[in-house]
Amino acid sequence: MALKTFNPTTPGQRQLVMVDRSALYKGKPLKKLTEGKHSNGGRGNTGRITVRFRGGGHKQTYRLIDFKRTKVDVPATVERLEYDPNRTAFIALIKYADGELSYILAPQRLAVGDTVVAGSYVDVKPGNAMPMGNMPVGTIVHNVEMKIGKGGQMARSAGTYAQIVGRDHDYVILRLNSGEQRMVHGRCMATIGAVSNHDHMNTSIGKAGRTRWLGRRPHNRGVVMNPIDHPHGGGEGRTSGGRHPVTPWGKPTKGKKTRSNKSTNKFILISRHKRKKK
C-alpha cells in the first residue's frame, strides 16, 4: 500500500505521512474473534509503574489471531483484510471450507479471494503454512515458531521476514532481519511470505498528540530530573550528569551487554551484534 501525505494546513499535517489504508475493510472486527482489552497505564499488579511513559491512548479491542495454524489440509478463502490497532501489520479474516472463521497475519501480496492452506506439504505461496523442514532453502517466511506447537513468535511486525539459508540435520538455519542467524527445529511451523504493511517504516507521526493517541507519554531525560528520580538528576543550573550514562536504576547504558547466558545460546550461529562491529 502507498503512503499518504496531506496539505500543510497545520504543522502537524505538514509533517504527517501515513499508510493509505483505503483498501482495507472499513467495518468493525468479527465480534466472536475479539476480546476486551484493559489498559493498565504501565502499572503492574501492585499499582506501581513497571513501564515508564505509558498511559492514556485510544481504547482498543484485541483481535484473536491464529499464530499456530494447526487446522491442516483445510483450504481457506480470504474474506477481507483489516486494520489491527494492536500491531503494525494488517490482518486477514479467512473462512475455512467447513465454515470456520479465523484471523491470521496478512502477508504481502495476499488479496481478497485468495486461498490459503496449512499442512505438511503445501504450495510455496504467500499465506500458506507448513513445517520449515519441508520448505526449500531460500524461502522467505514469517510468523516463525521457536518451539514446536507454541505458535509463531518471530517475524510478526510489519514488513519483517526471515529467510531459510540452510539445513543442519533436524534443524533449519534462519537469517533474521537483524542479521542474526539461528537454528530452529525443522518441525516448527512458519508462514510463507513477508508480513504486510512494509511501508510502516516510512511513516511520520507528525505531532506529539498522535503519539499520545497511541498510549505513549512524554519521555523525560534523567538530567532534567531531581536526584530522587534519577542518578543523573540534580545540580544547580544545567548539568551534563557528571557520570557515565546509566539507567534510572544505576546500570550502565549506551551499549553495555546485560543479557545473561542462556541454554538457547547454542542455537545462535551469528549474533545480530556482529555486523555492528564491522
From Swiss-Prot:
This protein's UniProt keywords: Ribonucleoprotein, Ribosomal protein, RNA-binding, rRNA-binding
Protein's UniProt keywords contain Glycosyltransferase: no
SUPFAM superfamilies cross-referenced by the UniProt entry: Nucleic acid-binding proteins (SSF50249), Translation proteins SH3-like domain (SSF50104)
Name this protein carries in UniProt: Large ribosomal subunit protein uL2
Biological processes annotated in GO: cytoplasmic translation
Assigned protein family: Belongs to the universal ribosomal protein uL2 family.
UniProt source species: Afipia carboxidovorans (strain ATCC 49405 / DSM 1227 / KCTC 32145 / OM5)
PROSITE patterns according to UniProt: RIBOSOMAL_L2
Stretches the record annotates as Disordered: 222-278
Subunit structure: Part of the 50S ribosomal subunit. Forms a bridge to the 30S subunit in the 70S ribosome.
InterPro entries assigned to the protein according to its UniProt record, in alphabetical order: NA-bd_OB-fold (IPR012340), Rib_uL2_dom2 (IPR014722), Ribosomal_uL2 (IPR002171), Ribosomal_uL2_bac/org-type (IPR005880), Ribosomal_uL2_C (IPR022669), Ribosomal_uL2_CS (IPR022671), Ribosomal_uL2_dom3 (IPR014726), Ribosomal_uL2_RNA-bd_dom (IPR022666)
Source species, domain of life: Bacteria
GO molecular function: rRNA binding; structural constituent of ribosome; transferase activity
GO-annotated cellular components: large ribosomal subunit
Function of the protein: One of the primary rRNA binding proteins. Required for association of the 30S and 50S subunits to form the 70S ribosome, for tRNA binding and peptide bond formation. It has been suggested to have peptidyltransferase activity; this is somewhat controversial. Makes several contacts with the 16S rRNA in the 70S ribosome.
Signal peptide stretch: none
